[in-house]
C-alpha cells in the first residue's frame, strides 16, 4: 500500500544523515506521485464472475492463495476483497454475489474482515431465481452495500427477498420493503 509506505517514511527524519537525506527526499517524492496516481473510488459496483477453487488452473489457484488468502475459495470473493481495497476511506462497495460467503467455513476470514472493518449498510438475500436468465435453483445470491470505514456499532438495513420466484417478484418485494421502512 503506497499510502502506508509513504506515511512510514515521512515519519522518519533523515535530515541528520547526509548520505540518506537526499535519497530519502527523492523516495518520498516518487511515493507522493505514486499515491496521486493510485486509483481509488468513492463507489465500486460489481456483479463478479463465479469460479470455485476446483475450476481454477494451477497458476490462478496459486496466485489466489498468495494474494487473497481470505477469499481464495472463489473468484467472486476475491473481487469482494479487491473492491474493498479499491474504495476510498468512507466509500461504498455494492455487489451481488453468491451467498455462500455468509455461511461456508472457507469464507470465515473474509466474513471476519467484513464484520470487523466494513459495516454492512444494507443487504438483501435474494435466494435462487434472482435472475430470470439463470433458471431454477442454480445459484442463491445476495445483494449488499458495504462501507470502507470502521463503525463497530453501525446497524444496517436488511431485506429478506428469498421467497419471490422471478426478478419481477423480488423487485416488487424490495419496493414494498423500502416503502415500509425496510421491514421485509
Predicted regions and their residues:
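Polynucleotide-recognition surfaces of large bacterial nucleic-acid defense/processing enzymes
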Residues: 1-41, 118-124, 129-184
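Conserved Class I SAM-dependent methyltransferase catalytic core
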Residues: 50, 69-128, 144
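Short secondary-structure boundary/capping segments
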Residues: 58-67, 105-118, 138-143, 159-165
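A generic short-segment signal for beta-strand/edge and adjacent turn/coil regions
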Residues: 10-16, 62-64, 91, 109-116, ...
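SAM-dependent nucleic-acid methyltransferase catalytic core
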Residues: 1-86, 95
Amino acid at each position: 500500500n503506497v499510502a502506508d509506505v509513504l506515511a512510514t517514511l515521512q515519519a522518519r527524519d533523515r535530515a541528520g544523515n547526509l548520505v540518506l537525506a537526499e535519497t530519502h527526499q527523492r523516495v518520498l517524492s516518487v511515493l507522493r506521485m505514486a499515491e496521486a496516481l493510485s486509483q481509488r473510488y468513492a463507489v465500486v459496483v460489481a456483479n463478479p464472475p463465479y469460479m470455485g477453487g476446483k475450476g481454477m488452473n494451477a497458476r490462478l489457484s496459486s496466485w489466489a492463495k498468495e494474494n487473497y488468502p481470505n477469499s481464495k475459495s472463489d473468484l467472486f470473493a476475491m473481487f469482494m476483497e479487491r473492491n474493498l481495497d479499491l474504495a476510498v476511506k468512507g466509500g461504498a462497495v455494492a455487489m451481488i454475489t453468491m451467498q455462500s460467503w455468509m455461511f461456508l467455513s472457507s469464507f470465515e476470514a473474509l466474513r471476519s474482515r467484513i464484520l470487523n472493518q466494513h459495516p454492512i449498510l444494507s443487504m438483501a438475500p435474494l435466494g435462487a431465481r434472482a435472475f430470470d436468465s439463470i433458471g431454477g435453483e442454480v445459484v442463491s445470491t445476495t445483494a449488499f452495500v458495504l462501507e470502507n470505514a470502521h463503525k463497530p456499532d453501525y446497524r444496517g438495513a436488511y431485506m429478506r427477498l428469498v421467497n419471490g420466484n422471478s426478478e419481477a417478484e423480488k423487485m416488487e418485494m424490495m419496493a414494498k420493503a423500502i416503502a415500509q421502512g425496510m421491514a421485509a
